[in-house]
């Protein structure tokens, strides 16, 4: 396969290298990743400045491209400009830190997989608990296993997978679960501080004690030491509500 690897932690991130080491054994792997960390930039792209691409001579070998833009920019460039033929698969990760529940909406890692999905390229976003995780290599090996197994199942159009892993050795992982996205609000708090001039400034801070999730959701599974796999659609239409709205007559 022709595989593009990307992330939002930047081209020098350990999680990206762990994936490269595993997948480059049997596939052509091209790394197209942000030149610096671009965490939590969501699905932003660069419209008002040119994108610079610097090909790196990486110690691991292979093709590595550092891009001045966002994770979504990296995937767009990889599909439209840098790879010929188009990639068969895009893998985004391994992210340092989970992208479950509401954090999917902020994540550059998830957005990169979504961007590939928009172009009809199969894709998967992979994230692991921990800052930084201790088991990137095992996470990369597990990702390879998932890709091989999931290749047996044809994914529906406009769908990609969001995978979250506990930061545990493989023998301590309790299982793998296909589950829904948790809908709890993000576990954030805002810290207000004062600078040396007495002016207020604010930091977002993550509250890891914010709920265990409910039911068969990604957050709940991860609390139990289980790998969560959530199918995500690029079609944001709520079809149930759409059918109800069609019952209304709105005249201008």
Swiss-Prot record:
Enzyme superclass (EC): hydrolase
E.C. designation(s): 3.1.3.5
Annotated localization: Cytoplasm
Keyword annotations: Cytoplasm, Hydrolase, Metal-binding, Nucleotide-binding
Transmembrane segment boundaries: none
Record text on cofactor binding: Binds 1 divalent metal cation per subunit.
GO molecular function: 5'-nucleotidase activity; metal ion binding; nucleotide binding
InterPro entries linked to this entry: SurE, SurE-like_Pase/nucleotidase, SurE-like_sf
Role summary: Nucleotidase that shows phosphatase activity on nucleoside 5'-monophosphates.
Family per record: Belongs to the SurE nucleotidase family.
Annotated HAMAP family: SurE (MF_00060)
NCBIfam families tied to this protein: PRK00346.1-4, surE
Protein known as: 5'-nucleotidase SurE
Organism: Desulfosudis oleivorans (strain DSM 6200 / JCM 39069 / Hxd3)
Gene designation: surE
């Amino acid at each position: 396969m022709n595989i593009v690897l990307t992330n939002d932690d930047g081209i020098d991130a350990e999680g990206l290298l762990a994936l490269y080491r595993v997948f480059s054994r049997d596939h052509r792997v091209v790394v197209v990743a942000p030149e610096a960390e671009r965490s939590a930039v969501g699905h932003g792209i660069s419209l008002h400045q040119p994108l610079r691409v610097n090909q790196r001579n990486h110690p691991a070998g292979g093709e590595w491209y550092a891009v001045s833009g966002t994770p979504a920019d990296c995937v767009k460039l990889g599909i439209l400009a840098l790879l010929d033929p188009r990639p068969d698969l895009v893998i985004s990760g391994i992210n340092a830190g989970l992208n479950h529940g509401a954090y999917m909406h902020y994540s550059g890692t998830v957005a990169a997989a979504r961007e590939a999905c928009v172009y009809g390229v199969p894709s998967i976003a992979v994230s692991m608990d921990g800052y930084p995780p201790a088991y990137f290599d095992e996470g990369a090996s597990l990702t390879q296993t998932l890709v091989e197994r999931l290749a047996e199942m044809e994914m529906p159009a406009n769908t990609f997978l969001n995978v979250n892993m506990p930061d545990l050795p493989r023998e301590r992982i309790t299982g793998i679960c296909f589950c829904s996205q948790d809908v709890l609000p993000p576990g954030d708090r805002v810290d207000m501080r004062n600078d040396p001039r007495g002016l207020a400034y604010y930091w977002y801070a993550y509250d890891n004690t914010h709920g265990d999730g409910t039911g068969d959701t990604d957050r709940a599974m991860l609390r139990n030491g289980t790998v969560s796999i959530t199918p995500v659609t690029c079609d944001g239409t709520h079809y149930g509500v759409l059918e109800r709205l069609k019952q209304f007559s709105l005249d201008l």
